[in-house]
């Protein structure tokens, strides 16, 4: 079901650097008239890197370059910023007149705390935040013992995990038919890694 009740929305890419089989993108495209995609190089994470030219940054840069090219080919673009997402996300929401933020969940402690700050700030401005499961098959409370507690023994957990996959399958999110709802705009060029 497509329900474009949101005019503009912002999709925040993080660990999920792709435009296919992407839960938050799929949901944003189905619920929004125009979706702006962004990625933020979080300076609080970058500052912790011991090596300035870390290979992970190079990998991310190449993935962003590919995403930007794919978006450019269909008249859209990728917003890439460097800074604190707690400041930048609300700023981008205002700049692009978005009424919703879509993102896939991140399960790291720092990310959970950061995302909570962002959601609270957006909520004050009546901006909806939609978070989706993406980087895991099952979240921590989706596979529990019969007592509704986490497993402490691996084999019963594994058996339940496999049974659940067999019974429910793994959902895939076909974004292609909805990419017409990507915002049509041109953003600044991608900076080189040296910049």
Give the residues covered by each predicted segment.
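Trp/Phe/Arg-rich N-terminal binding region typifying the photolyase-homology
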Residues: 1-166
